[in-house]
A protein has these predicted regions:
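Structural microenvironment flanking redox-active thiols in thiol-disulfide oxidoreductases
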Residues: 373-413, 425-430
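Short active-site neighborhood of thiol/selenol oxidoreductases, capturing the structured segment around
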Residues: 350-379, 393-395
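Short, internal strand/loop/helix patches
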Residues: 410-446
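Non-catalytic, surface beta->alpha helical segment in thiol-disulfide oxidoreductase systems
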Residues: 81, 436-440, 446-471
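Bacterial Sec-dependent N-terminal signal peptides
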Residues: 1-34, 453, 470-471
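Structured, charged N-terminal subsegments at the starts of enzyme catalytic cores
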Residues: 204-270, 278
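N-terminal "domain-start" segment that seeds a small globular fold
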Residues: 314-352, 463-470
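A non-transmembrane, solvent-exposed segment enriched in polar/low-complexity residues
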Residues: 27-176, 183-187, 191-221, 225
Length: 471
């Protein structure tokens, strides 16, 4: 029996490993020199965005002339980050021009040699920062000085805003393929047809139709054929809004949203985006043993994964995913749990279906598992306090392969609930039940249908409380 304490860092590392192959798109070699004013450090780090992450590209040592030089192959085109310690100093562009120099003086003025793409990028960033600074300054002056001439301050601000808007418009027109233009355009919402408006407001009688239209056309301004955008912070920001705010947080709705996204991306030469979003949500849900993650994983595999829609996944990999979904399917919420019949260390047999309480907690644990011991302590407190209040029974099975350790632990901790002895091999052979890690808990209703599945005791208590409060 594998004894595992869930660790989010391990999960993130696993995702990083799986996501890396998508970097094979849009890569290039670069030779970049950075000359950075009065930054007295010997080492800096160059990172880049990719989806929801920042990826370390290289650690650079200070050259004899005080500069830092990045010379590296296979860097994804997009936005790079110059980092000192834990502080991101500035961002820059990885694009077609691959040999250039970026100078930053003590007054934070940028001078770029040999790269118009970055020269334009810094020009745009400078104008953007100036208008944001003026906005903050204007609001602060109005707030701090009640006697300030608000009209005058607002007029000054509005004049500068109009100048910036003109600058933006000219920039987008002159440089339609610049990454800055593509990033800003990518975040634009779809235009609202007049049929959904009542004056300047959304017509409340057509609100549902409008929401459907908005979600359906949400990606219209995103250029899926431009793989640079996945290596910017803009893509994941937009994707997060699409999945978390424009999509109902039910398993089937999430799967449909992913399917729709992939179909749109595929139709517009955006297979890298399709791979990313599927990798992200498949891995997020398949590695976490919670009921809602398992439901989502099964729905995504059923609705999204297919040879036609996901051609980058081999037939054997698809078969593996489908088999994994089929293994999880019988243990999803509202499914009937298996009638387990096992013995105590003293040889007495207990059947799960003989328990007639309103709730049953089926708890798989191991005597040598430290996380299990924490859950056991919490369960014991909960059981003593709420056994009669909530009409709940605990049906626990120790899966430790070390019989002596199990005997010693149970003698030291004589629990009041049912404690049975088995092992993972026996459960697999008798019930086709795979318990891959402990602790593992299932909350069942009076008919032994699954309500929740989790490795965390507190979620069991929260679920029961929530049900009781609704009744």
């Amino acid at each position: 029996m594998m004894k595992v304490k869930l660790n989010s860092k391990i999960f993130l590392f696993l995702f990083f490993i799986v996501a890396l192959p998508t970097f094979l798109f849009s890569q290039q070699s670069y030779d970049i020199t950075f000359k950075i004013g009065e930054i007295y450090v010997d080492t800096v780090v160059i990172k880049s965005y990719y989806g929801n992450k920042t990826i370390v590209i290289d650690s650079l040592k200070r050259e004899k002339d005080g500069s830092f030089r990045l010379k590296k192959d296979n860097i994804h085109k997009g936005i790079g980050i110059f980092t000192v310690g834990k502080m991101d100093i500035f961002t820059f562009v990885f694009d077609k021009e691959n040999k250039f120099e970026i100078n930053l003086d003590d007054n934070w003025n940028y001078l770029v040699k040999g790269c118009q793409e970055n020269d334009l990028y810094f020009e745009f960033q400078k104008a953007n920062k100036q208008i944001r600074f003026l906005e903050s300054k204007t609001k602060r002056e109005i707030k701090q000085n009640p006697n300030a001439n608000k009209d005058s301050l607002n007029n000054i601000y509005n004049t500068e805003v109009n100048k910036f808007m003109s600058f933006q418009k000219e920039f987008y027109k002159s440089y339609p393929n610049h990454i800055m233009t593509k990033m800003v355009k990518a975040l634009e919402d779809p235009q609202i047809p007049k049929e959904y408006l009542n004056g300047n407001q959304i017509d409340t009688t057509k609100k549902l139709e409008f929401i459907y239209y908005f979600r359906t056309h949400y990606w219209d301004n995103f250029d899926f054929s431009d793989n640079r955008l996945i290596a910017t912070p803009y893509f994941f920001t937009k994707q997060k809004t699409y999945m978390n705010e424009l999509t109902m947080q039910t398993s089937d709705s999430i799967a449909v949203a992913i399917k729709d996204f992939i179909e749109k991306a595929n139709q517009n030469n955006g297979i890298e985006y399709s791979k990313y979003i599927l990798d992200y949500y498949i891995l997020m849900n398949r590695k976490l043993p919670f009921a809602y993650n398992e439901e989502r994983f099964v729905e995504i595999v059923d609705r999204v994964v297919s040879g036609e829609r996901t051609p980058w996944i081999s037939p054997s990999e698809i078969e593996t995913m489908k088999a994994e979904a089929d293994k999880i399917r019988p243990l999803l919420p509202e499914k009937q749990f298996i009638n387990i019949s096992e013995k105590t260390l003293n040889g007495k047999t207990y059947n799960l279906y003989d328990i007639k309480t309103k709730y049953t907690v089926v708890y798989f644990w191991s005597a040598g598992c430290e996380s299990c011991k924490i859950n056991l302590d919490q369960l014991e407190t909960f059981y003593k306090k709420y056994k009669r209040v909530y009409d709940v029974e605990i049906f626990s099975i120790d899966l430790d392969n070390n019989m002596e350790e199990s005997i010693a632990f149970q003698q030291k901790h004589p629990f009041d609930w049912i404690v049975l002895k088995s092992n993972s091999t026996q459960l697999k052979e008798k019930y086709n039940l795979d318990i891959e890690m402990t602790p593992d808990l299932y909350l069942l209703d009076k008919d032994k249908k699954i309500i929740n599945h989790t490795p965390l005791y507190n979620q069991i208590e929260e679920t029961i409380r929530s049900i009781e409060e609704e009744e």
